[in-house]
Amino acid sequence: MFQKLIVITFAIALASANIFDFLNNFNTGGRQQQNQGVRTPQEYESVVLNSQCDKYLCPDTGLCVEAPKFCPCPYPSSQIRCFLPDGRFVCISKPAGEGISEKYNDPKTNWKIDAKDDNIRDCGWVNRAWRGLV
């Protein structure tokens, strides 16, 4: 009886795995999906070298801007740009959570917000970390 139960369980597991594998192949056309945003180094180099930008070409986004400080983050819907005391900037993930994430949606003001809480990683936290206070 116990052996029959093991055999039946194994057969069900095997059938389930095959069904899910079939559905996965059916949805992707039998091939691996590729990230369309990733370029090869050669393609990236070609884009940079053939750019018609006469100012500053942002390395992360390929946008032509007046100066490096105007480069946007590569993923503006989920990142904020925090300026460092030396004039450079870093892009970090927007803080998330109930009642917190809405404050960081406006790119014109989100870099000014400091929650003054070391558990919330915003631009205020970045500046405190830069100064060694975290």
Swiss-Prot record:
Belongs to the LCL2 family. PANTHER family: LONG CHRONOLOGICAL LIFESPAN PROTEIN 2. Residues 1-17 form the signal peptide. GO terms for biological process: ERAD pathway. It comes from the Eukaryota. It comes from Candida albicans (strain WO-1) (Yeast). Transmembrane segments: none annotated. The lineage of its organism: Eukaryota, Fungi, Dikarya, Ascomycota, Saccharomycotina. Probable component of the endoplasmic reticulum-associated degradation (ERAD) pathway. InterPro entries: LCL2. This is Long chronological lifespan protein 2. Keywords: Signal.
